[in-house]
Amino acid sequence: MEKKQISKIDNYYNKLLKIHGVKPHALGCPKGRQSIRFKNIDNLIFKNCKILDFGCGFADLLNYLIKNHASYKFKYTGCDVVSNFIKISRNKHRGSKFIDLNSDSINEKYDIVTAFGVFNLKYTKSNEDHFKIVKKELSKLYNISKKYLLIDFQSPFVDYKQKDSYHQHLDPLIKFIVKNLSRRFEIIHSYLPYEFSILIRKDSQITKNNQFKL
């Protein structure tokens, strides 16, 4: 992602942070929506797994995991390009690792990589250019995941679209995933009417009896 796009993201969310404070609306997310989308990770968690929360915001996913999956003793890392989000998250969760992507980089792999709400703000003037960024970032995230990549998008099947919002069409996204990432994926379009998630599984090898490994 280029500096001008990172600057747009930083400016956009800092304005919301100034207006709303440390609340879901500062992330461009209505109250109550996060916990619903986070449920998509429930069946992926396993003992001692390493999780990367890409675009972590206020580390609300970590709050959810602690509340619902503490017994798995997972290792959480959050990262974001909005430095103020990282500062807030570090103060809230002093025992967890947070990466400010403006000054640090991701140097390891994770069992589960999530990206919630990351691609909802349109970074460019055209949808085509934004989708190029989506594909580039998905490739990076897929490469640092060991087992699962879980991402969400705003659905194209809506009654209206806000000015700077990005709604991902399914057909080009699926074609990209199948061709460049994995043939093992799930589309989850049943938990909210205006967004969907895609779970991409890293292991797409076929065994001798022509079945996917589990």
Roles of regions detected by a PLM:
Residues 112-131:
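A short SAM/SAH-binding and catalytic strip from SAM-dependent methyltransferases
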Residues 145-154:
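Conserved beta-strand signature within the Rossmann-like core of class I S-adenosyl-L-methionine
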Residues 105-113:
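A short acidic, Gly/Pro-enriched loop at the edge of an enzyme's catalytic core
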Residues 52, 58-99:
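Class I SAM-dependent methyltransferase SAM/SAH-binding core
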Residues 1-22:
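N-terminal, positively charged/glycine-rich alpha-helical extensions of SAM-dependent methyltransferases
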Residues 133-140, 144:
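Short, conserved SAM-binding segment of the class I
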Residues 32-48, 64:
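Conserved alpha-helix/loop element of class I SAM-dependent methyltransferases that forms part
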Residues 161-214:
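Class I S-adenosyl-L-methionine
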